[in-house]
């Protein structure tokens, strides 16, 4: 049976990571791959939805002359419009990526890549997020200035993806992070989220009118607990596969109820 795949990202519709993943999925599987992605860079937007402004869909050509749909909104907007306007049905899979830079730790809640995957799951699709480690942080938002090799990562993702085609999907979203030097022989490790992937730093600068402005920045955390996604990617150089759920309720809800229900 032909798979229906909605392919989205947060780096924008002309990202080479998106194109590489589309080409591998289209050529290696019996699948209709529909690309619906943001017109502009949307990194760090999380799962935001555009409630207060209209959205436009523009049919466009990718660099390989294939067709895609550019949306003037967020990655989650792309999922909603992709399902309800372009496809007019829920696809088998929503796949978000390949992102330029890894998405690790609990900070995934800020990721547009993960936001789109969660949105896809929310509407009933099986969902993957795929990200490629980029150790040169200054290149993460300058893809056009320095070529980043995505084909290897796309083929590694294929190896992971095909394992879940003939089995019940185990979670809401599978978060796949791929080391920048990964090959098809790189071990795949099932991981949990680390606490943090970056330190938090605020840099103050002064504009020509002597007013302060700020950049939120940070530095990669290298030391995390073994078994976490950060440790797998940055220390062991393994492919990290983290099963995620939309339900963020505390795990020990019964204990919480026992302790606090008498207070209300």
Swiss-Prot record:
<comment type="function">
    <text>Nucleotidase that shows phosphatase activity on nucleoside 5'-monophosphates.</text>
</comment>
<dbReference type="InterPro" id="IPR036523">
    <property type="entry name" value="SurE-like_sf"/>
</dbReference>
<feature type="binding site">
    <location>
        <position position="99"/>
    </location>
    <ligand>
        <name>a divalent metal cation</name>
    </ligand>
</feature>
<dbReference type="GO" id="GO:0000166">
    <property type="term" value="F:nucleotide binding"/>
</dbReference>
<keyword id="KW-0479">Metal-binding</keyword>
<dbReference type="InterPro" id="IPR002828">
    <property type="entry name" value="SurE-like_Pase/nucleotidase"/>
</dbReference>
<feature type="binding site">
    <location>
        <position position="43"/>
    </location>
    <ligand>
        <name>a divalent metal cation</name>
    </ligand>
</feature>
<keyword id="KW-0963">Cytoplasm</keyword>
<dbReference type="Pfam" id="PF01975">
    <property type="entry name" value="SurE"/>
</dbReference>
<protein>
    <recommendedName>
        <fullName>5'-nucleotidase SurE</fullName>
        <ecNumber>3.1.3.5</ecNumber>
    </recommendedName>
</protein>
<feature type="binding site">
    <location>
        <position position="11"/>
    </location>
    <ligand>
        <name>a divalent metal cation</name>
    </ligand>
</feature>
<dbReference type="GO" id="GO:0046872">
    <property type="term" value="F:metal ion binding"/>
</dbReference>
<dbReference type="GO" id="GO:0008253">
    <property type="term" value="F:5'-nucleotidase activity"/>
</dbReference>
<keyword id="KW-0547">Nucleotide-binding</keyword>
<keyword id="KW-0378">Hydrolase</keyword>
<dbReference type="GO" id="GO:0005737">
    <property type="term" value="C:cytoplasm"/>
</dbReference>
<comment type="similarity">
    <text>Belongs to the SurE nucleotidase family.</text>
</comment>
<feature type="binding site">
    <location>
        <position position="10"/>
    </location>
    <ligand>
        <name>a divalent metal cation</name>
    </ligand>
</feature>
<dbReference type="InterPro" id="IPR030048">
    <property type="entry name" value="SurE"/>
</dbReference>
């Amino acid at each position: 049976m032909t798979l229906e795949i909605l392919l989205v990202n947060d780096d924008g519709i002309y990202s080479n990571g998106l194109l590489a993943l589309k080409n591998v999925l289209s050529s290696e599987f019996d699948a209709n791959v529909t690309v619906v992605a943001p017109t502009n860079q949307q990194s760090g937007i999380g799962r935001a939805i555009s409630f207060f402004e209209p959205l436009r869909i523009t049919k466009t050509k990718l660099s390989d002359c294939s067709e895609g749909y550019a949306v003037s909104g967020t990655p989650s907007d792309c999922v909603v419009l992709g399902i309800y306007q372009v496809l007019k049905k829920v696809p088998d899979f929503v796949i978000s990526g390949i992102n330029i830079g890894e998405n690790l730790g609990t900070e995934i809640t800020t990721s547009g890549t993960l936001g789109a995957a969660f949105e896809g799951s929310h509407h009933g699709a099986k969902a993957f997020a795929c990200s490629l480690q980029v150790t040169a942080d200054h290149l993460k938002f300058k893809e056009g200035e320095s070529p980043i090799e995505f084909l290897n990562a796309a083929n590694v993702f294929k190896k992971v993806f095909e394992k879940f085609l003939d089995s019940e999907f185990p979670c809401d979203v599978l978060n796949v992070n791929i080391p920048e030097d990964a090959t098809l022989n790189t071990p795949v490790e099932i991981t949990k989220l680390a606490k943090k992937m970056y330190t938090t730093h605020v840099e103050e600068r002064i504009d020509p009118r002597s007013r302060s402005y700020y950049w939120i920045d940070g530095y990669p955390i290298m030391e995390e607990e073994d078994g976490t996604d950060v440790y797998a990617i940055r220390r062991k150089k393994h492919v990290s596969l983290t099963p995620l759920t939309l339900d963020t309720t505390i795990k020990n809800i019964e204990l919480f109820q026992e302790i606090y229900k008498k207070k209300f």
